[in-house]
């Protein structure tokens, strides 16, 4: 009898360990990242994000977490912000996620900021990124017409309202990237926001920021 007990003891000990410490019996699953909604700029489309989205995929981000949204860029940024609100709700419903990250290029920074500030976006957005965003205006917008371009001009009523008070409201984590060689959004200081992490890239053109590998790495670290 004693020999049988001795033989059964190791199995009994293993069974007790599994009951007492179940978390050690299986590895914890890796949480899926927040979905990313990419917001392009003026006279562009969602395809402008192909390079950056491809880098996210190569790093293991699932396709259903990457949304290259397209909208009519000539309309008012307030109109675009309302459409963005609907897109964010669609993505959250489709993925079951609690919040998204917004990654914006150029004028896309303005509609996404309007959404955060005025349409309840801070409750649904964990991290926000502005790449070469004319957050305080750019004189290059005087060379184009229509509501969107008018709103991008320094001193516009749209920008004055957007930048009055807290430029980075809510618990959303804000970050901006500006290039010293951007000839469309200048000076580079127009990109920075009070309360955000404001960074300067290498000498990149306006349409190169969202295609640059180093910028992608920084963006991934910020939203990750």
Residue ranges of model-derived segments:
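Cleaved targeting-peptide boundary
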Residues: 28-34
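C-terminal catalytic-base region of ester-bond hydrolases, centering on the histidine
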Residues: 151, 159, 167-224
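Secretory targeting and sorting signals
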Residues: 2-27
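The serine-hydrolase catalytic nucleophile loop
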Residues: 45-51
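A short, Lys/Arg-enriched amphipathic alpha-helix followed by its capping loop at the start of a domain
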Residues: 52-61
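Serine-dependent carboxylesterase/thioesterase catalytic core
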Residues: 34-40, 60-63, 69, 74-168, ...
